[in-house]
A protein has these predicted regions:
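Generic structural motif
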Residues: 4-7, 16-31
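Residues immediately C-terminal
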Residues: 9-12, 104
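Generic short alpha-helical segment signal, independent of protein family or function
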Residues: 12-15, 34
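Buried, small/hydrophobic-residue-enriched core segments of structured protein domains
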Residues: 33-183
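N-terminal, Lys/Arg-enriched amphipathic/low-complexity engagement segments
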Residues: 1, 12, 44-46
Length: 183
């Protein structure tokens, strides 16, 4: 029956305790379901009628502070390290960060439509990631003349991809822009 806010840590990664998974809603925890060997299966939260979130300050010019913010806010758990698609190890500097702003899958949502009205936040997020490592932003040719671009941040490269699926796949974009292995 604990009360949680949006962004309140629910649990941590037992291998890397800095990596947290946070509450997506504010409300009251109603159930914690565990499986074999106490494996966490689900956490149920009864949402409040009004959502209240924890506030986080965006760091100005420090890559390490950006990583700390990602860890504290629970967003670090959504990052993926290639080639094994695992959560990256905090404290290990990445070579590059890839962000794909489109999906070429059939019936996929149009990211430009989804991000409408949040272009400033999107650009601030890309600029913050660029303080950690060079960012490669993958877009399709239809997005070149949208409010998502241009992004005027150092260390941000915009790469335009076109073609059928899997052109929007991050792995394909990595292979075309900066391959993990050139062998």
């Amino acid at each position: 029956g604990d009360a949680v806010l949006v962004g309140t840590p629910l649990f941590v990664d037992k291998a890397t305790e800095q990596v947290k998974v946070v509450s997506p809603v504010s409300g009251t925890i109603t159930a914690v379901e565990r499986g074999e060997r106490r494996k966490l299966l689900s956490i149920r939260i009864q949402p409040d009628s009004v959502q209240v979130a924890k506030d986080f300050e965006l760091p100005v010019n420090d890559g390490e502070a950006v990583v700390r913010l990602l860890l504290e806010s629970g967003l670090f758990a959504y990052l993926r390290q290639r080639p094994y698609d695992v959560v990256p190890t905090p404290g290990v500097a990445p070579r590059d960060i890839f962000v794909s702003a489109f999906s070429s899958m059939p019936l996929a949502a149009d990211f430009t439509y989804v991000a409408a009205g949040q272009e400033v936040d999107f650009k601030a997020g890309i600029a913050a990631l660029a303080k950690v490592a060079p960012v490669h932003l993958g877009v399709n040719d239809e997005q070149l003349n949208t409010p998502l671009l241009p992004i005027s941040a150092p260390q941000v490269t915009v790469a335009c991809f076109r073609g059928p699926n899997p052109a929007g796949n991050v792995g394909v974009q990595i292979n075309r822009v900066a391959p993990v292995n050139k062998g």
